[in-house]
């Protein structure tokens, strides 16, 4: 089977002198604030500040606060890899070709894996002069996901030949791309605009509280129940003398069960469910956390929320020891835990709640580490990928 090898960024062409017209391609909608959407919007916003012309070629999208959105398809809601997402219905190739001819993009930056019904047709219609770049995001949560993606590889194999370079957001995504799609890629990590997080201040209602915070969808995979089980153990075994508050940020189908668990274990007075948190409010909630806990059991290709918390929280960030989160926190394994091991998590929380210096020590390392993921740092690497691909196409 043929391998499609991602080109390395070794061009000597200047990285700062040329304005590019860039089209981000995503089968899903921009209406949800999930990781891939955050990736292209964060990168796109930064690219515009650098003088580039940025467009979004996406599945069915209703929001009107973003410029240059081309909503190309109707989408249907599905569950995949224990996530809720939307998949495009087939798009007219003629319509796609007309858009590509009219806009005349320098670069199409496609999010992988992709559907043959939208992104696949954009790739197939790309003019010869246009560089096609990909970013691989997925980490499988089950064998079924592996099988489904092998089938997707067969369906998109022809379009994959058109790519000039492929990146993966982490080593776990890189391995999956190689094993399932026979794509050799370069790891270029996810990125965050750190500015709103590093300058965030705690919400006034939590300013004087000792807090443990969870932020994410209230679904089984994100592991909020395991955090509550650890909190219940802390209380039942009197592991901590200091009073503290647990803040649960997010909505989802598990909310009723989580509230019921809190009441059954008599921790409802220390647990606050605040519901869905907007992107504008998220930095302040994270800044209110003495300990931010993300007990995801798997299916994570990276951990954008970890970076956001590392940049803004006033204490330690802990992550479930899945491959995606480990790619961010691996240098300090004491910040990783087996998410279903509530005894281990309870002990980690007890140690951090009792010891403010331990929290400060973790925070100092995390604040230093997260700067490597700031969008000006990662963005420059990606622009070099764009220009290297264009240089090769021009030869």
Regions found by a protein language model. Give the residues of each.
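N-terminal strand-loop element at the rim of the active site
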Residues: 13, 26-33, 39-91
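Membrane-proximal helix-turn-helix segments that form the acceptor-binding/catalytic region
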Residues: 149-166, 179
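Carbohydrate-associated surface elements
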Residues: 172, 191
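Conserved acidic donor-binding segment of nucleotide-sugar-dependent glycosyltransferases
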Residues: 319, 331-343, 350-356
